[in-house]
Amino acid sequence: MNLGGCNDMSQISEYFRSIFFPNLGITLRNIGDHINIGSFEVRFYGIIIMIGFLLAYVLVTNEAKRTKQNPEMYLDFILILIIPAILGARLYYILFRLDQYIVQGDVGATIKAMLNIRGGGLAIYGGIIAGVITAVIFCKVRKVSFVLMADTATFGILIGQILGRFGNFFNREAFGAYTNSKMAMAIPLDYYRSDGNLDYLERTGVITQKMLDNVVNIDGMDCITVHPTFLYESLWNLMLLVFLFIYRKHKKFKGEFALIYVGGYGLGRFIVEGLRSDSLMIGDTGIKVSQALALVCFVIAVVLLVINYVRCAKRGWPAAVMGDAAGTEVKISGECDPADTEVETSGEADAAGTEVETSGGSDDAGEKKKDDKDATK
């Protein structure tokens, strides 16, 4: 094999770690998957996840301030969420890959393999499910609206997903089927040989026979060319986030942002998942778990959006989706109110549990004036 004049193993290793986009003329050299701090290895995937949580906090607290909620409440939630989200993502992945982790006759080795997340093996749907469960409990304890919190958290979830997919890039995973399209990404087979994973990836069908039949030689290295599905999904989520930023001043009802996210992400994931070669499957059915779940999410979200838009059209679109300066959302009779019938004060439940409603009818003050007038007659 010709490696372009490399004379030592470090140079050869750098070549193996190259990633190419040959049809775009892009070459990325020496793309590792970790850094060493002393004797400790830190995976880029983990670093990206932490950066994602930090940026999620920035976006979520910004949205909380805009909607007159308490931003500190979201900091509390994010700190609580980190461990359940990672555990949920890991358990979801393991559930559909049990054969990969179970070591017959050795419970200790099985548990160790399941807990070793440094080499990858996280599924976003598991993290979202764990996040929803955590949020429901959190909202019950804090006595705040789960739906309003879901709307606010949507911005953080999206930025986390946008960045998180680049962890797949560094790990050379979650890619799609063979392609020679303009966006084709080329990965040297020797990258997988170097860490002993090539045989496993071929055996499990992640690296397919079609990829091997269409190997291309770049700089003296045999490379598979695949769809960079991590990039497709990241760009799709970026478009969703930009749309929500543009649209957020026109919110029609509480829960709208969350439903737009669920439906939009479901549609994008359904399409992208169809291209992937490493999908988790439902037993031997040939059905991809994430694709099926994405379709269900898309359908449910669209149905709920249509129902709420029809309801809003019948009641009259709201004149404003925000409340007063104190952060109280006021229900105006006859309008489709984003707060439904709840009062949100700085993200905490109103101490009296009251609802504020204004309408064309008489209020308590009006009744009192009437009584006073009658008394003077």
Question: Model regions: which residues?
Answer:
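A feature for loop-to-transmembrane-helix boundaries and adjacent hydrophobic helices
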Residues: N2-K377
